[in-house]
Every structure is written in structure tokens, then in C-alpha cells.
Amino acid sequence: MKKLFVLFYALMCLVTLQAQKVTLQDVANGTYRAQSIQGLKPMLDGEHYAQISKDHKRIVKYSFKTGKEVATIFDVATARNHKLKSFDDYIMSPDESLILIQTETKPIYRRSFTAVYYIYNVRNRTLEPLSNNGPQQVPLFSPDSHQIA
């Protein structure tokens, strides 16, 4: 009886496998690629996530429950001390009090790049350059959010 069950199961698997025809065109077009959301970064409270606006001028806070915009975390128009036209990416500090704003990104090789970074204080809405000595590569916040390496 077990042998019949295994044989029946194997035949069913073969039939379902033959139903799908995999073509080179489907593979090249990304038909079988996993879908994901780009640029979505969960926040500490677990209720919200942050995402860059389409025009790359704001970091917007959204609700996971409703998917609606809740607040604007960063806006190039309201940032004080420095004016930016837009930005490329951002890195939030572990306590979400500071944000590294990435601008003027220049690729080096494959996934490596240099960029000019600014430190944005969420509470004061002030924007200060990370360095006056040119672009940096891979800056990171310390676990206590007080230093940047």
C-alpha cells in the first residue's frame, strides 16, 4: 500500500511539473524573481516604516496597519543650516534621533560607492556635514548613536 501511495505521489508531481514550461525568455524577464518592496525601513516602534518619497526630497513615515502617510521625518525644504535639492539614501541611527543623509553618490565598482553625507538631527531639524574633507565611504553609527565611524 505504501509503495502505491509513493508511486501515485511521484506521478502527480511529474504531471504538475510538466504543466509549467520554463523558457529562457521568462527567466531573463524576471518572471520567477521574488517580489519585494524597495527602500522600506521598519522603525523602532514596530507600528511604522520609513520610505523615501518618489521625488527624493522627503523621508516619509507610514503606518503598517493602514499604509497611509503619518508624518514627514525629513524634508529638504525644512532642513536648517544647509540646503539640498534632493538626496539619494539615508541611514537612521539606532535610536532614530539622527539620520545620515546621503547625497552626491558616485559609484566605484559594483556595489561600492562614495557619497557626501550630512547629519540630520530629527528633533532640531538641523543639517550638518559629516565631513568637510570630501566624500566618505560606508559610514556607520555606534550602537549608542553618539558617534559615527
Where does each model-flagged region fall?
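Bacterial Sec-dependent N-terminal signal peptides
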Residues: M1-V22
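Beta-propeller folds
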Residues: A19-A149
